[in-house]
């Protein structure tokens, strides 16, 4: 089981600084969509240039022109790139192809997918590296959790890894870990903690069953 830190609300310098503080406890560091909107792909490059032994994910949430956008993210140092599960099949297939051609990985974000079971099966067959169930900020505010979605997707896929994101914190991560996802994505639960290193350490301990 892997742990990913999602960083959404910092500039690229502060993001790299935070990532380096917790890198002993995480496997993947994400440059979140808001940072990419604010600072562009150079934010991904800054992270890639300033951290080692950790994969860098660019949360592009690609919807179209997928092979080009994947190739650009890779050019700027991304190891993992995200595309939306609601994108056209053709877009997802070319994104997977482009990522794999460069020995990189593609994560498909299931945010706003209505028929999770059907889409997860399709994406699994297409060769997605990760399929991520994701309760976005706006639904978290309504009290929703990704737990049920995680169970649904995990029950139907054969090859892809299952990732889970959405409001996960050190004090709630154990119920997520109990469902055995392959990748747990924690954002504010680490980034906004009073002590991010301690929060990351607690999350790592939870996924290692300690």
From Swiss-Prot:
Entry keyword annotation includes Lyase: yes
UniProt keyword Acetylation, yes or no: no
Known EC number: 4.1.2.43
Listed name of the protein: 3-hexulose-6-phosphate synthase
Family: Belongs to the HPS/KGPDC family. HPS subfamily.
Species assigned in the record: Staphylococcus aureus (strain bovine RF122 / ET3-1)
Domain of life, source organism: Bacteria
Annotated pathway: One-carbon metabolism; formaldehyde assimilation via RuMP pathway; D-fructose 6-phosphate from D-ribulose 5-phosphate and formaldehyde: step 1/2
Annotated function: Catalyzes the condensation of ribulose 5-phosphate with formaldehyde to form 3-hexulose 6-phosphate.
GO molecular function, one term: hexulose-6-phosphate synthase activity
Lineage of producing organism: Bacteria, Bacillati, Bacillota, Bacilli, Bacillales
GO process terms (BP): 'de novo' pyrimidine nucleobase biosynthetic process; formaldehyde assimilation via ribulose monophosphate cycle; L-ascorbic acid catabolic process; one-carbon metabolic process
Keywords associated with the record: Carbohydrate metabolism, Lyase, One-carbon metabolism
Catalysed reactions listed for this entry: D-ribulose 5-phosphate + formaldehyde = D-arabino-hex-3-ulose 6-phosphate
């Amino acid at each position: 089981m892997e742990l990913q830190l999602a960083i959404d609300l910092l500039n690229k310098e502060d993001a790299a600084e935070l990532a380096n503080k917790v890198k002993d406890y995480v496997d993947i560091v994400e440059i979140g969509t808001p940072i990419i909107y604010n600072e562009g792909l150079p934010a991904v490059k800054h992270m890639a240039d300033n951290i080692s032994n950790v994969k860098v994910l660019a949360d592009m949430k690609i919807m179209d022109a997928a092979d080009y956008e994947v190739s650009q993210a890779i050019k700027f140092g991304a190891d993992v790139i995200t595309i939306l599960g609601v994108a056209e099949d053709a877009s997802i297939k070319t994104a997977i192809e482009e990522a794999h051609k460069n020995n990189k990985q593609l994560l498909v974000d299931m945010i706003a997918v209505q028929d999770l079971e059907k889409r997860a099966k399709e994406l699994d067959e297409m060769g997605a590296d990760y399929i991520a169930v994701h309760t976005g900020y706006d639904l978290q505010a309504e009290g929703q959790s990704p737990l049920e979605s995680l169970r649904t997707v995990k029950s139907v896929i054969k090859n892809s890894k299952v990732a889970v994101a959405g409001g996960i914190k050190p004090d709630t991560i154990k119920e997520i870990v109990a469902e055995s996802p392959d990748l747990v994505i924690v954002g504010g639960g680490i980034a906004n903690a009073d002590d991010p290193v301690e929060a990351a350490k607690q999350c790592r301990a939870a996924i290692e069953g300690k």
